[in-house]
């Protein structure tokens, strides 16, 4: 059998030196930061950690040295210029539009309910009329069939045998 490769993982980290990194560029003790570095860590990791702190300190210096743009445009006051609306007017308009939307929704619901009631009343009338028509049709059918049956039975004595056979076959055909 071939040997299975083994991987050995270390349980303990070896702590090495403490590095001092200058964050703000001042040579004071307050601006110095101590970083623990592993002796067995990758070289790129230790380089990248110190490099990132140096970049951070340079970026911080550049930001503090830059003068900010006009602060009048970026800051807002309670009373705006005459051409622009104040925040109070904007909030009132927003509240009014919300209230208008709510009232519009309520009005639409009321209109829908009224239309449904009208549709329901017309549909009820249509249903009642269709029931009346069906009842009248069934009554007339019963009357015509009953009367026809009675006349056939009363006059069956006067019919000949072939006429009786054809009458029976016609009745059976209508029953199907």
From Swiss-Prot:
One of its GO terms (cellular component) is host cell cytoplasm. One of its GO terms (biological process) is viral genome replication. The keyword Ion transport does not apply. Keywords: Glycoprotein, Host cytoplasm, Nucleotide-binding, RNA-binding. Its main location: host cell. One of its GO terms (molecular function) is RNA binding. Pfam families: GBR_NSP5. O-glycosylated. It is found in: Host cytoplasm. Homodimer. Interacts with VP1. Interacts with VP2. Interacts with NSP2 and NSP6. Plays an essential role in the viral genome replication. Participates, together with NSP2, in the formation of viral factories (viroplasms) which are large inclusions in the host cytoplasm where replication intermediates are assembled and viral RNA replication takes place. Orchestrates the recruitment of viroplasmic proteins such as capsid proteins to these factories. Belongs to the rotavirus NSP5 family. This is Non-structural protein 5.
């Amino acid at each position: 059998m071939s040997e299975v490769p083994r991987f050995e993982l270390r349980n303990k980290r070896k702590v090495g030196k403490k590095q001092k990194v200058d964050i703000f560029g001042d040579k004071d003790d307050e601006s110095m930061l101590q970083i623990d570095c592993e002796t067995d860590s990758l070289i790129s990791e230790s380089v990248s950690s110190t490099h990132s702190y140096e970049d951070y300190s340079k970026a911080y210096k550049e930001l503090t040295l830059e003068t900010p743009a006009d602060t009048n445009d970026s800051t807002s006051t309670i009373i705006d210029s005459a051409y622009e609306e104040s925040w109070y007017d904007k909030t009132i308009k927003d509240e009014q539009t919300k209230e208008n939307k709510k009232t519009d929704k309520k009005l639409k619901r009321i209109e829908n309910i009224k239309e449904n009631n009208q549709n329901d009343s017309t549909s009820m009338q249509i249903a009642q009329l269709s029931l009346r028509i069906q009842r009248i049709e069934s009554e007339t059918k019963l009357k015509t069939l009953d009367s026809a049956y009675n006349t056939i039975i009363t006059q069956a004595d006067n019919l000949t045998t072939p006429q009786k056979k054809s009458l029976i076959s016609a009745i059976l055909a209508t029953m199907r």
